[in-house]
Amino acid sequence: MAFVVGEYDYIEAKDSNGVLIRVYTPLGQKHFGQFALDVALKTWPFYTGYFKIGYPLPKPDLIAIADFAAGAMENWGLVTKRETALLVDPDNSSLQSKQRVAIVVGHELAHQWFGNIVTMEWWTHLWFVFLDKFVWF
């Protein structure tokens, strides 16, 4: 479980299955979250269709947090990320920055299935949580 308290802007859209996805950004930076939202809108229906398991919460949220030490964390329903792992300047970000954001968004959303809906039986099975790497191949 996670929650964030602060002043944020957000952008939102529904994916092809009608699931509302929100990306929270620092105030005045909504346009920097659009790329991550676009990636999430394509990734979310893929996972839902591939695993044939719907998401039991009303919506997933992604939030950019300044100086977030972990880089990113797949909390149940609230994916928290360092700003550099979620925000993209549409006019100035490099292709490498966009690729990094796309990989991190896909990775953390996959954890909503691997690690949240289905989780390991014991710590010796920690590898299971990182099965999302299959999407890279």
Model regions and ranges:
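Short, intrinsically disordered, charge-balanced linker/junction segments flanking boundaries
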Residues: 125-129, 137
